[in-house]
Amino acid sequence: MIVAQVFFEDINNEKNKEAFKNYLRGKDLMFVGVGTTKAYLDSCGPKICSKLKRDNLTVFGTEEDQFHGANIERKINVLNDVYKNKFKIAIDSCVSEAKEINSIILDNEGLKPGAGMNKIFPRVGDFSLKIVMSDSADEIIKYTTTSSCEVNELKKVFDRVDRAVQKTYTFIMMCLRELENEMKLKKWS
């Protein structure tokens, strides 16, 4: 079920941050990046998890060790066995309506990878952050092979993905820092 939708220009909205933090409080967290850098519009999950890994957070599915449709059935068992006690937050790019592009959909039911491409894979995570990158699965496929694309067109796509990664990463880190500060205040009171 969708808990909140956060548009990039509104990541500081207290109501949206609180909706996310409510699911994080008191949990042993990890982040799961779903997607591939071979399809640039589908690369948000591994790119964000690579950034979170540099902040020493527990992650699965980075740019260096991707978690995507070609390996999900093999790797999901590792994820669920090794990290069975973690609260898994799945992060993936997704396809939705045009009016939802440049937003993050917070969902408390985990993630159904490949749904936008009509593929059926096992559900991933306990909670998900779905980054709306396009309103068309065809656009995702178009940027899988870049040989037919103009350089200027590719640059725009790269900029879109970079912005989505930065905004989502910022939203996650703001919420985690606020939770950390709440814990410190409780400890001192």
Where are these regions (language model features)?
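N-terminal catalytic or cofactor-binding beta/alpha core of small enzyme domains
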Residues: 1-189
